[in-house]
Amino acid sequence: EPPELIGSGRAVSKVNPDIISDSVNAANSVNSNVNILCGAGIMNDDDVKIALNLGSKGILIASGVIQSNNWEQKITELVSAFI
């Protein structure tokens, strides 16, 4: 999670996707049971889908929901990427 992207609305999955795939590869080389979570700038279901396609097993969210006008709808949108 690059600190400069936290709360920025700029998803690490789009700005620097190599961070996710490199982290997944590094973790798996040590222990294949480690699940990598992606955070920093996750704002929509597209950000989530990209993170999952890069090998992330889940996401961390805060500002993406808090800054939404309808947090229930935002959570539903983000969760839909897992289905």
Where are these regions (language model features)?
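Glycine-rich phosphate-binding active-site loops on the catalytic face of alpha/beta enzymes
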Residues: 2-10, 52-75
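Glycine/Thr-rich beta-alpha phosphate-binding loop at enzyme active sites
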Residues: 2-24, 43, 74
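Alpha-helix-loop-beta-strand connector modules within alpha/beta enzyme cores
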Residues: 14-34, 78-83
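Extended, folded domain segments that form the structural surfaces/walls around functional sites
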Residues: 17, 22, 45-54, 65
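Catalytic cores of alpha/beta
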Residues: 30-59
